[in-house]
C-alpha cells in the first residue's frame, strides 16, 4: 500500500489503478490496470513464495529424557541432513480459543533464542556412517529442541515448564497448537559470498529470487495498454495443491473478478493473455559436474 496499491474490493479496476488481492493469507495477486480492454489480454508473471521448511505437527510438544521437543514434519524437497545442528527460527500464527490471532517470530533478532535439531557426535556415529545419505537422518528424528529446565524444581516436567513460559508470554495453552500454523526455518540472515561479494547466500531463494524482481518490475513499469499482473503463489514445493496453489482456480477467480468489474469477456481475456512462470534452476556446479548436462546448463559466468 505504501507503493499505491489498494485492495481489489476498494478499486473500480480502471486505467492506471494499482491493486492487490490476498488469497487466504497465503498467496497474493498484484495488478496494474492498463488503458486497454481486458479482452485484449493481460500479462502475468507467476512465482512462488513458499520454500522447504519444517512444520510443527498439531500437538507438537513432548518431553523425552529431560528434554522438551517439537515434533515436526517436513514441507517440500529438503535434504534432511542439512537441517541438523543448524540454528532455527520459529514463524507462524496461533489462533486462541477466543479467536485472537498471535503472530510468532522467534529467532531472527540477536537477543532471541534459537532452536536446534541434534545430530550424533562423529565418534559415536559409526552405524550412521554406514547408512545411505537418504536414510542417515530419518524424518522421525527431526525433533526440535526447545528447552531443558524442569518446572519449579528438579522433579518437575520440562514440558510443563515450556508450557508455562508460553502461557506467560503469549497466553496460550497446549490445545492452542491445534489451531496454530508454525514453521521452523534457518535462523541465518542473507550474506554476501566471496571476496568479491559476487554471490548471495540466503534461505528461500527458490523462488523468492524470482518473486522479488517480478514485483519490482511491476513497480517500475511504465503505463501501458496491457494490464500487468504478478502472482505470488503458495504450495509449489508440495505440488501446487490446495486453494492457494496454482493447481487451484485462484488465478481464474481473480481474472473473473477483474472482468466482472469492467464488463470484459473472461474467455477472450484468457485467450489473448500471456503468462511467464518464473522459477529457478540450478547453475552448473563443477564440483558435481556429473549431475548436470553441461551444454544445456545455466552458468554464473
Model-inferred region functions:
Residues 1-301:
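N-terminal hydrophobic/helix-forming segments and targeting peptides
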